[in-house]
């Protein structure tokens, strides 16, 4: 007997889970196909930051804020650990402080709850901050912290208990209009098919990626043992200002980039910007570097890890910590400046990928858009 669904989702990372979630919320019969026993890619290898502060004001900021709402709903419904810990951007140079002042004073901060703190006020808000050399801090209360190593499993379990058909340890080897073929030869039939295959650009619709400027990105990360302090808030420094689109229109950003290129070129050569997230158990997730291209080495470089730890150690007290884990993640990213790759290679099949390292922040809202639009299209077709 044919297996018939309203929606078939390929890939159980955060993008795939979000499509299944949106389909379920719309009353659809959903099947979710995942080739691994559980999510093992970028969804579990990241900071766990829900990061509206880094998204450009406008469409992406609104998406991030909607995703934030969805994560809080998942915290209530699925038991996902999502904490409203906020973020702190640390300025240790006058040009970095100028960027933060420009950001708060302009429309670039629209939709956020931001404030500027003196070194004294910042040290009271974050007991681990190093005050020596600190110029000022921008604090935002908008960002969430989730536990990436458990979030996907909890969402998947809740989806399954709510009626979504979970097909684990089986891969989709072919997708056509209305049908997905699995490795065991089974055929699933569905009105809408969403392909969210993460870093796998070769199996399903490789032409869709070849037509776009898509690259894989390898990033090195670590976790540190819990320090003596507990702050919760995500920490970012001056390097991060040049990484996220939210700060692009701040006039002083050029000075920040030029100074790092001149004085510390190693960071730019390896795409390093440094952030830290504190887990519920107090341990720190830190990173990261960015190496683009198909030939990224499978071996991690300790000089990159050392540079990340040393830079973070200038912002917060790491004297009582040590490295407990090292890993690298890989994600797909569009290199033409666009936020997401979305296309329909054949009628009824949507490929969604390349959210550029912001899958946790943008994925839930983008998936909601995709599902809503596909349902609207189907309704229009019925009335044509």
List PLM regions with ranges.
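Glycine-rich FAD pyrophosphate-binding loop
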Residues: 25-44
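Flavin-dependent oxidoreductases
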Residues: 175, 186-277, 294, 298
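Helical element adjacent to the flavin cofactor pocket in flavoenzyme catalytic cores
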Residues: 137-178, 188-192
